[in-house]
Structure formats: C-alpha cells, structure tokens
Curated annotation (Swiss-Prot):
The myosin motor domain displays actin-stimulated ATPase activity and generates a mechanochemical force. Residues 1015-1025, 1076-1088 have a biased composition (Polar residues). Phosphorylation of the TEDS site (Ser-361) is required for the polarization of the actin cytoskeleton. Phosphorylation probably activates the myosin-I ATPase activity. It comes from Schizosaccharomyces pombe (strain 972 / ATCC 24843) (Fission yeast). Residues 1093-1103 have a biased composition (Pro residues). It is found in: Cytoplasm, Cytoskeleton, Actin patch. Residues 724-744, 745-770 form the IQ domain. One of its GO terms (cellular component) is cell cortex of cell tip. This is Myosin-1.
C-alpha cells in the first residue's frame, strides 16, 4: 500500500490512480518536514539489518524503555502496552498527525486512524482497523484512541453531526461498564468482541454507526476466579445506586451479594466505581436512553443480584428446597410473577417424551440442589445476555442514519485476544477460534496485497514460506470431515438429555481427528495446536455449554411476567413440535465469525498488533521471554520477510522525487524542486547522483522500489544533512537580519529620543527667548544654538543627596532647576560683595542654600525658602547682566537679589510653574532688602567689561550686549542625506599602544586573543581578540651610525585597515627609512673636493650594557600572522616590550614578534649581560664558546641580521608605492 501525499484534503476524493508516466504538474516546492522527532532503535521493523525474533524483541524493548511504544512493520502498527500514561494522546499531538502521511510522523495509533480516514475519503473505499493481541495488551485503549481521532478530524458544523459524534464516543464508557471486567491479566479486560462500523457521507462526515457484538462471556456472571471481578456495572451500581433504586430494588453493597463477593475482590487500584457510574449515567443520557428504560435496566441487574443469593438444600424426596423464602418473595415482586412459579421453575424440571411426530407423556422431575443451582445460574446468565444485546440494539437505534448520502465506512474491531488458562473450556475454544479466523485474514490479505502490488508494478519477487493457519480453522469449523463444532453437535443430538453422556459421545467422536497434525487427544481432554501455542481443552461440560438453551419452564416463567420490558428482551420460544434442530452456541459463533470475515474482506484493512510486556501490569518490567513468545505466534518475523520479500521500501515516483530532490543539483535548486521532466526520470536522476547501485533499486510502473534498508538510511541521512546545512544558513541569515534590524531600531530610537528631547529643550528655550524678546540685551552665549535648558545642573534631584537632604525633599518633590548663584552680602561701612550660594527650585518651593563651616565642619543650610505661589514678580535690568530680583509678597525676610548665569532658563522655568509671576525689565531693579525697605539698583554701561558684569556701590557695571531683538540660533542638525557617522566626520585614529623608538611599518595587525591561564586551541584563539600592538623594531647600531637626511618623509600605510576595527597608526621616523639614508658615493677622479681641515668627529661612546629580560616558554604557540612569533615549550626568549593587553614583544635570533603573556614565565636561570647592539649580544653570548661554535653563531646572527634588514627594506618599499 503506497504512502500517499496529502496535497489537498478538501478536494473531492475522485483522483485517479497514479499516472504511469509520472508526469509532473509544474514546479513544486520541497517541504522540510520537521514534525518527525528523533527516535531510538528503528521505528519500522522492515529496516532491521538482521531479521530474527531476538532482534525484533531487542528493538521493541529498547523503544519500550525509552517511552516509544509504537513501531511499524510497513503499514502494520505494533503496540506495546506501557501500563502508564505517557502523555502521547493530547490534543496537540492529535492535531500534529492530521493531514500527515506515515513518513512525516512518528509511529502512532493516530497515524493508522489518519491513513484509514484519508483512504476512505479520497478513494471511497471501506476501511477496517483490526486490533489483535492477547488480553491486557491494550486493544480496547487503541480502539478508543482511534474513535477519538476519527470523530475529531471528521467533525463538522451541524447539530445532527455533533450528536452522532457524541453518541459514538459515549458508547465507550457504556459498553465498558457492561462488557468489561477485572481479570488477573487486565484491570479493564473486554469480555466481549465489538465491531464498530462508523458510517460517513461523501464529505467524510460521520452520519451514523453500527455496533456488532460477539462472544459475551456470560459465564462470568455466575463464576469468577479468585481476585477477578464480575462486570464493572455490578460494582458501580451497588456502590453508587441512587436512593430511589435502593428503596425500590433493595440494593445494598457488593459485599452482600454472592455474584459480586465470591471472588473476594470488591475494589481495583486505579478504578473508581463511583466515578465510572456517573460516566455510565451520562453516556446513557447522551445516547438517549430514557429514564424509564434506565429503571428497567437496573431492575434486571437487581434481579440477577438477588437470584445469586438464592441457596438450596436437599428436600425429603431427594429434591431441593429454597433456604430463604424471603428472597424469592422479593424476586416475585421484581420479576412480576407469583412466588410459587419461581420456586417451581428453579426446583422442578418438566420433561416431555416424544414418539416420532406425536407428543408423548409429560413428567415433572425434581432437581437436586446442584441441579437447582445450575438452573438459577442459567437464568441469571440468560437475563444478562439478553440485557446486553438490548443495550447494543438501543445504541444502534440511536446511531441509525437517515442521511441518503451514505458513502463509506470505517470499521474498528476490538475483540478479546487469544486465551490460554489452566482450565480451558468451550468459551476459550470459541475465543481462540475467532482469533484464528482473524489471523487467517491477516496473513491472506497481507500476502495478497504484496503479490498484487508486485504483479501490478512488474516486479519479480521470491515467495516467503509462512504458516497458513487455515488447517486449524478447518479443524474447528469444518463439516466434512467433521470438525470440533460438528462433533459436539452430533454428540448433543445423540444424548440430548444427559450432559455426561453427551460429553462421552463427543470424546468418542474426537478419535476421528487423531490423524490431524494440529490435534492431540488425551484422557477427557484434547489439545489444539493454535498459531499462538498449544491449548489443552477440558471435555467436561463442553457439550452442555454448546447447547446454550434455557429450559422450557424457565422461558414460560419469563413470558408469564407482567413486566413488558423483561418479556421484550427475551426471544420467543420456538415451537416444540418443530423438527428443525435449534442452533447451538458453536453454530452461532461460526456464523458470526464467517459474517465478520466476509465484512472485513470487503474493506481495506489496517492492522494493529498489540503486545503485553509483562504479567504484573508494571510500567517498568519487560519480560523478554513473554514478549518473544508473542512475537513468534503473531508471526512478526514472517510479516517482515513478506514486506521485505523483494524490497524494504517502495514509494510513488512523485513523492520520492519531491522528498529526495534536494540530493541532486539537477532536480532542485536551493531546496526548490526544479525538475521539468517526468517524475520517473527525476527518481532515476536522484539515484544516479547519489551513487546508488542499480542492483539496490528497481523502477516499477508508478513506484520506485529500494531493496535494502541501509540504502534508505543513506538517502535519509544525506537529506537530513542537506536540511541541517540549509537550516544553519537560514539561521545565520536570520540572526544577521535580526541583529541589523535591532541595531537599526535602536539607532532610530536613539535618534528619535534625542530629537524628541532636543525638540522639547528647544521649545522651552524659545519660550524663554520670547519671554525677554525686545526687552533685555542678550549675552552672546545665551543665544548659541547648542544652548539647552537642562534644569538640574547640581543633581539635586538625586535621592539622599546632599542638597536633597539639606532641603528636606521627598519622593513627591521634583527638582526642576538647580544652579550655583551669588547673592549680595551687606557689610557695615563697606560696599556689598557677592557671596556664593546654591539655588534649588521645585514645583512648590524655591530654596537658597548656603555653605558654611559649623564646628569646624563644612555644612549646608537653607538660608531662604520661598513658596513659588508667593512670588509676585521677577525684576531684571534691560542690559546683558545676570542679576535677578525675586519679589516675595508674603516674605518676612525680604526679597532675593542674586546673580544667576542661567537667568533666562531660571525665569522661564519659574514662569512655567506660576503663570501669575510678572517679569519686570527696566534700567533699574527694585527689591526689598528688608521688609518695607526698598532698595534700588542702578545700571551703568562699562565697555571695559565685555562678557561679564560687576556690582559696586549699588550699581551694576556691564558692557553692551546683543540687541534685545536677538533670537537664539537653531539647534545643530545632522547632515542631510548622510549617515550618523558621516555627519560626525571622520573618526580620529586612536593610538592604543605606545610608539616604539624606531618603529618599522608593518601590515595592519590582526586581532589577537585575550591571554588565558592555560594554552588554548587555535580555534579558540580566533574569538574576541583585542587589537595587537604594532610591531616595533629594536635599535640597530649599524643603521644608527649611517648619516640620515633632515627631510621627513610621509610613509603610506601598506594595508587597508578595517573600518570596524581601525589599526593603531604608526609614525615612522625618517631615520628609519632606508630610502632616506645617504649612501657614500664611489670616489671619482679629479672631481672630488679636498677634505676639510676640520678633524672628523670622535667615535661614539660604547653603548651602555643592559640586562636581558629572559622568559621561558610554558607551552607551544604557533604564530598565524607575520607579526606573531612561533615559540616552542621550554624555549628561552627575550621580552623587549610588555603591553597591558596581554601581548608581549619578544626577540629571538634577531627576529621580533608578539607572543601571549600567559604562555611564558620569567626565566630564573643565569642571565648573561649584553649590549643594546644585536651584534654585541651575539658576541657576548658566545664569548666562552669554541671557535667553531663562535663562527657558527656569528654566521647565523649575520644571516638573521641580513634577513631582518631585507624585511625592513621590503616593508618600506611596500609603504612607498
């Protein structure tokens, strides 16, 4: 079955089969599927490299212990019961599988449901999902999850549609209560088989459903194994019955009834009977079971419970009598019949003889206590069985559809699994027979599908041997030769009245089956070799269970009841003179199984094979032997081999091409599917470009087949790596984009905020200019364009600051203006002199703060405090002076007269707080120095004072300022059309490192790594480097001795410096440039001037002896640029310059280079003395060596000097171009 591509689920599912030519419908985009998470092991067992039962078991265990309970075999799902909630059934996970194919998602029961729903909707084919496995393996849970998924994805708007979906979901709790019970293997074991067929219209919307019931284990009503329980509904009803039922039906606790307490297990861990009873009642309400119908249902349950409490004792005539007559009296009330009729039906059996077609005599045969108990139990089982059938029919009635647009259906089969007990009887034979039929369908349909696909695709394959269990099915159901069911029917017909005789006759007829290799007969037992293992069945009582008929007197008792509901649920008794043999239980089972097989054969099947990991129901235990046995009898190995018979993987051309197109440059570009030819040729091109041998694949008519799973692994791995690379590129581009966007946004915000602040500052400044416009001469600095009114120049608004505490401000006091100022201090007999003060203005008060020494400590005190609301006016002169008079109408200490350099800002701020303040400008200023005493201050022009004023003898002397009509210049703006950096102009080069004595111009140094305590790798050293210091040359006595010109030559930089990290500029002395060194010319005859009589200068004094700063290399360091030195561990080098950045300039063999400071340590050995000259260094270092060694050292040093001089000249030549 091909993996389908979900292109458009909304389209009508009328698409034809895949085009054999594989012609593409235009360019399509390759989609990166990221929904599939990484898994452990292999999620498809067909991809196992080694196919054995042990390898299958190992892979399932590995996934089980990692919480991966689902695994594929192709399209077959293997489910291992986790016995815990893994959180894998949430609504988000459910939605993640909607519209996805198997390759796009991890194995899950939702994927099986999605595939079945899509196939049904797209191709109008009936689907069925067959869930098989042993009891406790999780079949019922899987069926519930499938119903949950399908009802969700098919949900549509409409009252009727929503009602149908709700009823379908409500059938689960209802049928679980009446059809499930606690067993030793499973706390919620299905004791019946159920086939739910969901019916959909052409739009894929559910319009109805039908439930078919199989094999209800009615024997559980009267008999349970120790530590098992009866059906859940009995415990729910007896624990949580409403009071009206307790009063009407006499309901008591479960411990008071034999049918519920004999097993000695009234409660189960993890099951709340009270809560489940409410769920059952809600389900009945949703389905539409009326309250009178509910009353009758619980009446039948009450009858069964009270029947179980009837006990018999032996009578005088050898018959039996009822021990407690009160129970039968209450049962007569519940059933609606006389008490005597109940006692007669339970203790007496009516037998009738027959002579051919004539009716014979009628006899009343008394029953002993054992026989009476059997009749009681038969009645109880019959009531419950008929009640269960009625509930199923009632649900079907609620789900019946009136929609004429019925299209297709999806069937979900949940039937209890293969059973092997210590004592196996007729019930286990029927259950195992049905499982054999399902196994037969699985094998035939799986093999048939594979065969048809290979034939259709013209692919040759080798058939795989497998066990065909048809022989086992024939052993049970065959008529000729007679099988087990036929032998039982013959035995019943021979000895109808006597069960023991019938069992004996059945045992004799089994001798005819002894030649069957799958059958063995033993004393009073027989063995059937099923596909799941050998099962030993007991013959005792098997024929009686096969008859499954109520006695005539019991049926007569039921139909004599005045309860119409009870009579309606029981079938009408057949006429006693009918010669036709009534069908036995085996006949009904065989008919139901064949009908089920016929229904399933008309559908496209999907399979879920459930596995139980342990018998303890523990979430942590994995019984390898137990699972291995299930793997074997489920035939998983054969299924894998059938799936891999020819090829482990097959896919349609278009899907394969679109999935793996990225692996070929001819079929895709940048992740886009660009192939213009047909899909088949695209697949061939992809396989060719990925170097897949032709022996590893074959091309069918519409699909590509890959032989080994390793080939698929290789393709998937290459595809993952491609998308990983693409994802990395996208992430890198996205991060770069986000960073640029963030930086741009930050720049815009910064500029906008600055512009916004500047606009506000400019507006306030212009307001002040307007306030004094045409009234007062202006100072030159007052109208500068860069002048801004910041206000709090003394940071008085800082909480707990000096001025804050001095003025006693609180959090609610906002400082608007603070400034240093001067006030006139009046002294007796002398002119007043300005004295410094601090001015603080808030929205409420104006403070004048004085600083003075108190007790030899410098302290601050509030000298004056004015309420802003009490200020009447402000006085100024009409000249450019800075004196201001603040007149306080309610002041007791006089006004303030002070000099404030930012007077315009101060007055503007004051005016904005109190609009009633008058600004008085004139040639004089009047203020009250003391209360009631007016002082007049005059002004006088003095051109000797240009930019300042002074006070003397009541007169302010000031020079002529700018005209009163002067306006403030506009704020400076950034250059239009240029960037911020361009507007600021070129950034000056920052010299980070000290200049050397005679620097040598080198190419711009690369960034260096920060020094580390331990050696780091090369990759680590390339990150976060600070700029390295420029290379500097050591003094060279040879060059220094040569005459130099006095002309300074500009040296061009040899390399281009990065804009983001400018290299430190170096200034090269003319003396260090070889091009500027004067070379002595050769002597020329007759043209050489005579030497001067002046004697030559004396030779220079010997250089001072300096001590070498030697260091020992701790680690190896490999230089990666020309200005870095390569050093080896334990090598001794000389450090000539240390930089705080962590890079030191080292000297070794006459060559210099930078090394990390953390890679070297101070050398503690003997330090030889040397001169500054490199030549003398070499000589003194080798003064104790042999002549040969001295010559070698001298030669090496000379070579090093020549190389260094050549390097210097080369560098200078590069800078001259």
């Amino acid at each position: 079955m091909a993996i389908l591509k979900r292109t458009n689920r909304a389209k009508a599912a009328t698409a034809a089969a895949p085009n054999s030519t594989g012609k593409s419908n235009g360019i399509k985009k390759a989609v990166y599927t990221s929904t599939r998470k990484k898994t452990v092991g292999v999620d498809d067992l067909t991809l196992l490299s080694k196919i054995t039962d042990e390898e299958i078991n190992k892979n399932l265990e590995l996934r089980f212990r990692n919480g991966e309970i689902y695994t594929y075999i192709g399209h077959v799902l293997i489910s291992v019961n986790p016995f815990r909630d893994l959180g894998i059934y949430t609504m988000d996970i459910l939605k993640s599988y909607q519209g996805k194919n198997r390759l796009e998602t991890s194995p899950h029961v939702y994927a099986i449901a999605e595939n079945a729903y899509y196939q049904m909707k797209s191709y109008h084919e009936n689907q069925c999902i067959i869930i098989s496995g042993e009891s406790g393996a999780g079949k019922t849970e899987a069926a519930k999850r499938i119903m949950q998924y399908i009802t969700h994805v098919s949900k549509s708007v409409g009252t009727e549609i929503e009602r149908v979906s709700e009823i379908i979901l409500a059938t689960n709790p209802l049928l679980e209560s009446f059809g499930c019970a606690k067993t030793l293997r499973n706390n919620n074991s299905s004791r019946h088989g159920k086939y739910l067929e969901m019916i959909f219209n052409s739009g894929g919307v559910p319009v109805g459903a039908k439930i078919t019931n199989y094999l209800l284990e009615k024997n559980r009503i009267v008999n349970q194994v120790r530590n098992e329980r009866n059906f859940h509904i009995f415990y729910q009803f007896t624990k949580s019955a409403p009071q009206k039922y307790r009063d009407t039906y006499g309901i008591q606790g479960p411990e008071n009834y034999v049918y519920t307490s004999a097993c000695q297990c009234l409660s189960v861990d993890g099951i709340s009977d009270e809560k489940d009873f409410q769920g059952t009642m809600n389900a009945m309400k949703v389905i539409g079971i009326t309250e009178p119908e509910q009353d009758e249902i619980f009446r039948m349950l009450s009858i069964i419970l009270w029947l179980g409490n009837i006990q018999f004792q032996e009578g005088q005539d050898g018959g039996s009598v009822i021990s407690d007559k009160s129970i039968t009296e209450f049962l007569g009330y519940l059933i609606g019949v006389p008490v005597a009729a109940i006692e007669r039906a339970l203790t007496i059996r009516i037998m009738q003889t027959q002579h051919g077609a004539r009716r014979g005599s009628v006899y009343e045969v008394p029953l002993n206590p054992t026989q009476a108990l059997a009749v009681r139990d038969a009645l109880s089982m019959a009531i419950y069985n008929c009640l269960f059938d009625w509930i199923v029919e009632r649900v079907n009635k609620a789900l019946v559809t009136s929609d004429n647009s019925v299209s297709n259906s999806i069937g979900i089969l949940d039937i209890y699994g293969f059973e092997i007990f210590e004592n196996n009887s007729f019930e286990q034979l029927c259950i195992n027979y049905v499982n054999e039929k399902l196994q037969q369908i699985f094998i035939e349909l799986t093999l048939k599908t594979e065969q048809e696909e290979y034939v259709r695709e013209q692919i040759a394959w080798t058939p795989i041997k497998y066990f065909n269990n048809k022989v086992v099915c024939d052993l049970i159901e065959s008529k000729r030769p007679p099988g087990l069911f036929a032998a039982m029917n013959d035995a019943i017909a021979t000895a109808h009245a006597d069960s023991a005789a019938a069992d004996s006759a059945f045992a004799q007829r089994l001798n005819f089956l002894s030649s069957n290799p799958h059958f063995e007969q033993r004393q009073n037992q027989f063995i059937v070799k099923h596909y799941a293992g050998d099962v030993t069945y007991s013959i005792t009582g098997m024929t009686d269970k096969n008859k499954d008929q109520l006695a005539t007197d019991i049926l007569n008792l039921i139909h004599s009841s005045n309860n119409e509901f009870m009579k309606s649920i029981f079938p009408v008794a057949e006429e006693s003179n009918s010669r036709r043999r009534p069908p036995t239980a085996g006949d009904r089972i065989k008919t139901s199984a064949n009908d089920l097989v016929e229904t399933l054969m008309k559908c496209q099947p999907s399979y879920i094979r459930t596995i139980k990991p342990n018998q303890t129901k523990s979430p942590n235990d994995y019984d390898q032997q137990m699972v291995l046995h299930q793997i074997k009898y489920l035939g998983l190995q054969e299924n894998i081999r059938i799936r891999r018979a020819g090829f482990a993987y097959r896919q349609a051309f278009d899907t394969f091409a679109q999935r793996f197109a990225v692996l070929s440059g001819k079929t895709s570009y940048a992740g886009e599917y660009t192939w213009q030819g047909d899909d088949k040729s695209a697949c061939e091109q992809i396989l060719k470009d990925t170097n897949i041998p032709s022996s590893e694949y074959q091309m069918g008519t519409s699909k590509v087949f890959i032989k080994n799973p390793e080939t698929l692994f290789a393709l998937e791995d290459m595809r993952d790596k491609f998308w990983d690379t693409m994802a990395t590129r996208i992430q890198r581009a996205w991060r770069s984009y986000v960073r640029r966007r963030s930086e741009a946004a930050a720049c815009i915000q910064k500029l906008w905020n600055r512009n916004k602040v500047n606009m506000e500052l400019e507006r306030v400044r212009n307001e002040g200019t307007k306030l004094l416009q045409g009234k007062k001469q202006r100072r030159r600095y007052s109208i500068l364009g860069s002048r801004k009114f910041y206000g709090d120049y003394l940071s008085a608004s800082k909480p707990n600051g000096t001025l804050w505490n001095t003025c006693g401000l609180s959090q609610n006091d906002h400082v608007i203006f603070s400034m240093r100022c001067e006030v006139l201090v009046h002294k007796l007999g002398r002119t007043s002199k300005p004295s410094p003060r601090q001015l603080v203005l808030t929205k409420k008060n104006l403070y004048l703060v004085i600083t003075k020494i108190v007790d030899q400590k410098l302290t601050q005190q509030v000298e004056k405090k004015f309420a802003v609301s009490s200020i009447d006016s402000v006085g100024l002169t009409n000249l450019q002076d800075d004196w201001v008079a603040i007149r306080n109408k309610s002041s007791q200490n006089g006004d303030m007269f002070l000099r404030c350099f930012f007077k315009t800002e101060f007055i503007t701020t004051l005016k904005r707080i109190n609009r009633n303040i008058q600004v008085i400008v004139g040639p004089t200023i009047q203020y009250c120095r003391k209360p009631g005493k007016v002082q007049t201050v005059k002004t006088a022009k003095d051109e000797t004072t240009k930019d300042y004023d002074y006070y003397k003898s009541g007169t302010i002397h000031v020079g002529t300022g700018l005209p009163p009509t002067s306006k403030s210049k506009p704020f400076p703006r950034l250059a239009t059309g240029g960037s911020t950096a361009a507007a600021r102009g070129p950034r000056p080069v920052v010299q980070n490192k000290p200049a050397a004595t005679k620097p040598v111009s080198m190419p711009a140094a690369k960034s260096k790594p920060a020094p580390m305590a331990n050696p780091v790798s090369t990759a680590q050293q390339t990150q976060n480097r600070p700029p390295a210091p420029a290379m500097q040359a050591r003094p060279n006595t040879t060059q220094a001795a040569a005459p130099v010109t006095s002309t300074t030559t500009t040296i061009k930089q040899a390399t281009t410096v990065s804009a983001s990290k400018p290299a430190p500029s170096t200034v090269t002395s003319a003396a260090s440039s070889p091009s500027n060194i004067s070379k002595p010319s050769a002597p020329v005859a007759n043209n050489v001037s005579k030497p001067s009589a002046v004697p030559p200068p004396p030779p220079p004094p010997p250089a001072e002896v300096e001590k070498k700063d030697l260091y020992l290399a701790l680690y190896d360091f490999a230089g990666r640029s020309p200005n870095e030195m390569t050093i080896k561990k334990d090598e001794i080098i000389e450090i000539v310059q240390k930089e705080p950045s962590g890079w030191w300039l080292a000297l070794k063999n006459g060559a210099e280079g930078w090394v990390p400071a953390t890679y070297v340590t101070e050398y503690k050995g003997s330090t030889p003395q040397t001169t500054a000259s490199s030549t003398n260094v070499a000589a003194q270092a080798n003064n104790n060596a042999s002549p040969a060694e001295v010559n070698n050292l001298a030669g090496s040093l000379a070579d090093a000097l020549r190389m260094r001089a050549s390097a210097v000249r080369g560098s200078d030549e590069e800078e001259d171009w």
